[in-house]
């Protein structure tokens, strides 16, 4: 590497250039010619004589033409002459613009080298500084390094020379890989020096790294030697001590021997452990035949016996994990897991192939000659063993679900294909939507039944299928495996939920008839129960879709009555007829309600198990379709039709009449369905409210008719006066009449005033009172019972007051009985007879 770094000394330098320093000789370059007397120099190039430097003998002549000679001195002489010739040829004038001094120097150099004769060529004149022309010649020939190599040739043996050439050759071969810039490295200037030094640094660093790498390999050995050296030295000292004992008697309390005995015991324990581990290894391994069954065997009972053995090995090898060293247990369990993973993949592929070929197989024997029942048993056993690998087991269930879902969906959709030749398609008819929905649901039910049979034939595990299963699998998956058929059935049927819902929903959402919608609700509920009996879970999507369709139908039923009230009733703002009968819309509306109630009561038992919110005629819905139309529509409409009812008693009588007629109609239509309204307190309150309103209006009508009757007979003023002091209804005996003695001072109670106010009106109106009340006032009441009740109560009140008022006047004026009988000229019997009261 020194040769590489200082290679610039081999080149010819421009001594006229002042920028670069002149190379300094590092070694003595004095040649043989320099030691001779000055005179004519022999320019024949001569290598330093090794023999002369070693033995002080005379210099031997060298043949310059010995390139092919076997003598090493002749070869080196030839190489040196060749280098000088190359230096001479590679350093001509570099540019035309040089000054005359440089040109002169160049010519002088050329002339000097030309005039040199081989015999006068001396190395000392080429490399040693001298005066005149010899100085430039010496500085331009060889570098200090070449002189060093040549002068020290006697110190370098043949192997070193070979190694030097080999190093240069290696650099030449790897210059591209090392990215060597040849021109820069051969540059004799300072840049070349830096490049060669950098190359040397890189080479030394790389060499140092290689040496460190080699030394790193000795570190473990050194550490092991250091770790064992103390023990070895201790053993050595102990052995020397024992051997030096002349008595050959070993003391019993020798600590060293006790320690050796302990080590011996430990060695025996280790041997025992090794024996146990070897026994365990022999026990927990598969032989070659079993391994071949796992790798190349078919899925049969023999295969499952081997798998069972592998699982038992895994279960029984858990105690190895209790050892201080877990490597054995971990290695065994890892190997067993690899075998189980291989077997599970093989079982998985077998199950997939079996599923694809199960439906298509037409004979009872499969490719392996087993019967169909045996194949099913192997299939179930394969499922049991595969259940230990949840990932593959779930993937199998997904494959089964996907395969069967596509199959049943294609079967379902094919029934709506109008071009189908295999079966009659399901056609939607506008005149019979119930039949269409029934056909759709019947088709789904048939598919569910067939699929349930298929799934149970493959995935319904019995105790016989699980009797030979390893305990570890049964403990983890027995419950899950026994319910896998139901889970698979539900997963497969989910593919029908959306298609079924779409075909039914297009009917439900556009059907307005509440009776048809109610039939749809019944049909959906019926098939929902049938689906659940086939194993479909209550929370599955197809059941949820049927429930949502039921809710839509129920909402359509309730919405129909709400829309009816909005569209029909709101258009009729007042009662157009004078007969004070209920509005026509109320009769029609009640007819529609009765029609719904009748069909609902026939199937009321089907909703007994449903919650209150899911019932069609729940208390909330009953309030919506019964109570709210009466409160929000009917009563407001009647109040609007008779705006003067609060001021005019005639108008009020008409309002009360139509209100009584309306509520009597409502009560009569709802009365047959008391059981429907008796399902809870909220529903019961609706009918109670209707009856209370009817009683309220009847009572108001009674009060109003009594008032009219007393006004027509002239007794209204005295009725108010008498009742103000003491109610007439409370008079029981003669003593009660004393309560009215204060009336004697009232001018209205004078007999002449009574005659004036009562006698004429009473005698005029009383004969026609019964006809007037029945014919004119109560004729417009549609209920004869209510009319008779009001009529009877009015005349009873009138008869009672007339009788008490007559007795009161006699009590007040006992001396004027004849005058009293004259004014109130009807006896009690006559009065009652005229007003139609029977005793």
From Swiss-Prot:
GO biological process: cytoplasm to vacuole targeting by the Cvt pathway; intra-Golgi vesicle-mediated transport; retrograde transport, vesicle recycling within Golgi
Region (Disordered): 14-38
Location (main, coarse): Golgi
Domain of life the protein comes from: Eukaryota
Function: Acts as a component of the peripheral membrane COG complex that is involved in intra-Golgi protein trafficking. COG is located at the cis-Golgi, and regulates tethering of retrograde intra-Golgi vesicles and possibly a number of other membrane trafficking events.
Further remarks about this protein from its record: Present with 1720 molecules/cell in log phase SD medium.
Protein name in the entry: Conserved oligomeric Golgi complex subunit 6
Organism: Saccharomyces cerevisiae (strain ATCC 204508 / S288c)
């Amino acid at each position: 590497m020194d040769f590489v770094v200082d290679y610039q000394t081999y080149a010819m330098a421009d001594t006229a250039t002042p920028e670069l320093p002149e190379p300094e000789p590092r070694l003595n370059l004095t040649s043989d010619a320099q030691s001779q007397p000055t005179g004519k120099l022999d320019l024949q190039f001569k290598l330093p004589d090794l023999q002369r430097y070693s033995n002080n003998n005379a210099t031997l002549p060298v043949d310059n033409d010995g390139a092919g000679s076997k003598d090493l001195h002749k070869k080196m002489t030839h190489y040196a002459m060749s280098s000088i010739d190359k230096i001479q040829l590679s350093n001509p004038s570099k540019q035309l613009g040089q000054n005359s001094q440089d040109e002169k120097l160049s010519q002088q150099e050329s002339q000097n080298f030309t005039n040199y004769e081989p015999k006068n060529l001396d190395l000392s004149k080429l490399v040693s500084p001298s005066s005149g022309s010899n100085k430039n010649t010496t500085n331009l020939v060889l570098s200090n390094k070449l002189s060093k190599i040549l002068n020290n040739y006697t110190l370098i043996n043949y192997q070193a020379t070979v190694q030097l050439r080999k190093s240069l050759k290696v650099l030449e071969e790897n210059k591209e890989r090392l990215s060597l810039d040849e021109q820069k490295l051969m540059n004799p200037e300072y840049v070349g020096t830096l490049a060669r030094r950098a190359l040397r640094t890189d080479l030394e660093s790389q060499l140092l790294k290689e040496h460190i790498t080699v030394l790193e390999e000795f570190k473990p050995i050194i550490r092991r030697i250091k770790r064992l050296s103390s023990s070895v030295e201790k053993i050595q000292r102990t052995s020397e001590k024992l051997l030096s004992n002349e008595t050959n008697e070993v003391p019993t309390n020798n600590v060293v021997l006790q320690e050796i005995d302990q080590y011996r015991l430990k060695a025996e324990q280790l041997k025992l452990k090794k024996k146990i581990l070897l026994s365990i290894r022999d026990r927990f391994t598969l032989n070659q035949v079993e391994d071949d069954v796992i790798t190349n065997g078919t899925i049969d009972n023999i295969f499952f016996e081997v798998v069972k053995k592998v699982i038992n090995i895994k279960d029984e090898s858990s105690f190895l994990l209790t050892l201080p060293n877990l490597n054995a247990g971990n290695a065994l369990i890892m190997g067993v897991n690899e075998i189980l993973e291989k077997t599970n993949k093989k079982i998985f592929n077998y199950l997939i192939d079996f599923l694809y070929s199960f439906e298509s197989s037409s004979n009872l024997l499969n490719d392996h000659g087993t019967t169909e029942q045996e194949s099913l048993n192997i299939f179930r056993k394969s499922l049991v063993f595969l259940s230990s690998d949840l990932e593959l087991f779930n993937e199998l269930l997904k494959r089964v679900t996907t395969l069967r879902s596509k199959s049943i969906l294609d079967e379902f959709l094919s029934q709506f294909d109008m071009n189908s030749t295999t079966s009659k398609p399901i056609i939607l008819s506008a005149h019979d939507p119930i039949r269409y929905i029934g056909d759709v649901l019947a088709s789904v039910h048939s598919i569910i039944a067939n699929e349930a049979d298929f799934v149970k034939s493959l995935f319904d595990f019995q105790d016989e299928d699980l009797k030979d299963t390893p305990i570890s699998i049964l403990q983890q998956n027995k419950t899950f495996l026994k319910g896998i058929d139901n889970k698979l059935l539900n997963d497969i049927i989910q593919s029908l939920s959306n298609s079924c819902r779409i075909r039914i929903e297009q009917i439900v959402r556009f059907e307005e008839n509440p009776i048809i919608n109610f039939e749809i609700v019944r049909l959906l509920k019926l098939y929902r129960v049938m689906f659940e009996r086939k194993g479909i879970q209550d929370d599955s999507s197809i059941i949820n879709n049927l429930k949502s369709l039921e809710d839509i139908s129920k909402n359509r039923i309730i919405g129909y009555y709400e829309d009816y009230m909005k569209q029909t009733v709101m258009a009729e703002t007042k009662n157009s007829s004078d007969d004070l009968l209920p509005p026509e819309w109320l009769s029609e509306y009640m007819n529609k309600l009765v029609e719904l109630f009748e069909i609902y009561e026939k199937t009321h038992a089907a909703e007994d198990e449903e919650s209150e919110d899911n019932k069609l005629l729940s208390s909330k819905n009953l309030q919506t379709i019964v109570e709210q139309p009466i409160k929000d529509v009917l009563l407001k409409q009647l109040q609007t039709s008779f705006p003067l009812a609060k001021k005019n008693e005639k108008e009020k009588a008409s309002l009360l009449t139509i209100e009584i007629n309306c509520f009597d109609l409502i009560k009569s239509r709802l009365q047959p369905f008391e059981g429907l309204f008796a399902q809870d307190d909220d529903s019961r309150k609706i009918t109670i409210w209707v009856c209370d309103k009817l009683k309220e209006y009847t009572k108001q009508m009674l009060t109003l008719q009594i008032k009219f009757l007393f006004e027509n007979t002239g007794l209204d003023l005295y009725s108010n006066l008498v009742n103000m002091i003491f109610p007439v209804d409370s008079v029981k005996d003669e003593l009660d009449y004393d309560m009215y003695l204060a009336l004697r001072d009232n001018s209205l109670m004078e007999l002449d005033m009574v005659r004036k106010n009562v006698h004429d009106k009473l005698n005029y109106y009383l004969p026609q009172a019964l006809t007037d009340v029945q014919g004119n006032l109560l004729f417009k009441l549609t209920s004869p019972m209510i009319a008779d009740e009001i009529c009877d109560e009015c005349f009873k009140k009138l008869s009672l007051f007339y009788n008490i008022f007559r007795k009161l006047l006699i009590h007040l004026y006992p001396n004027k009985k004849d005058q009293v009988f004259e004014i109130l000229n009807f006896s009690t019997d006559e009065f009652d007879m005229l007003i139609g009261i029977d005793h």
